[in-house]
Amino acid sequence: MNRNDVTEKIITVKVSKGIQWADVAKKVGLSKEWTTAACLGQMTLDDKQAKVIGKIFGLTAEEQKWLQVVPYKGSLPTPVPTDPLIYRWYEVVSVYGTTIKELIHEEFGDGIMSAIDFSMDIQRQADPKGDRVNVVLSGKFLPYKTY
């Protein structure tokens, strides 16, 4: 057994029971974005969170322990994503990455946006031309230090 096995079990139970990530997040007490990432194997849960997830998805004590192991982050199976939705994100970064970098540096100086001290919010935005996906990424700015 490993973390990937637990992730697969979570996904299988989610599909078979029609569970929604927002409902899981509500029970865990965290955002749907973070909770989903955790259930998909990208975040580490504490004991209390793992027990809640375990109850929802029928996980054994051993499987709950795997939820508490620091995961190998980055879940894409190929360097260039092949899933169409994930590829669009790759495309956004390919097209707008230098613009994002330039504007962040202009506003904040030399540094990076943290993906550790970070939050994300995904919402549906009604639009007469077709609903839109509204994604807000918020990361702490971390300036490079001189030494």
From Swiss-Prot:
**Pfam families documented for this protein:** Cyanate_lyase (PF02560), CYNS_N (PF21291)
Instruction: Give the reactions, separated by semicolons, that this protein catalyses.
Output: cyanate + hydrogencarbonate + 3 H(+) = NH4(+) + 2 CO2
One GO BP annotation is:
cyanate metabolic process
Q: EC number(s) of the enzyme?
A: 4.2.1.104
> Which keywords has UniProt assigned to this entry?
Lyase
MF annotations from Gene Ontology? cyanate hydratase activity; DNA binding
Keyword Ribonucleoprotein on this protein?
no
Identify the SUPFAM superfamilies for this entry: Cyanase C-terminal domain, lambda repressor-like DNA-binding domains
Superkingdom of this protein's organism: Bacteria
InterPro entries xref list: Cyanase, Cyanate_lyase_C, Cyanate_lyase_C_sf, CYNS_N, Lambda_DNA-bd_dom_sf
Q: Which residues form the active site?
A: R88, E91, S114
SMART domains in UniProt:
Cyanate_lyase
Do you know which NCBIfam families this protein is assigned to?
A: cynS, PRK02866.1
Describe the function of this protein: Catalyzes the reaction of cyanate with bicarbonate to produce ammonia and carbon dioxide.
Q: Which HAMAP family match?
A: Cyanate_hydrat
Report the family membership.
Belongs to the cyanase family.
Protein name per UniProt: Cyanate hydratase
Q: Which gene encodes it?
A: cynS
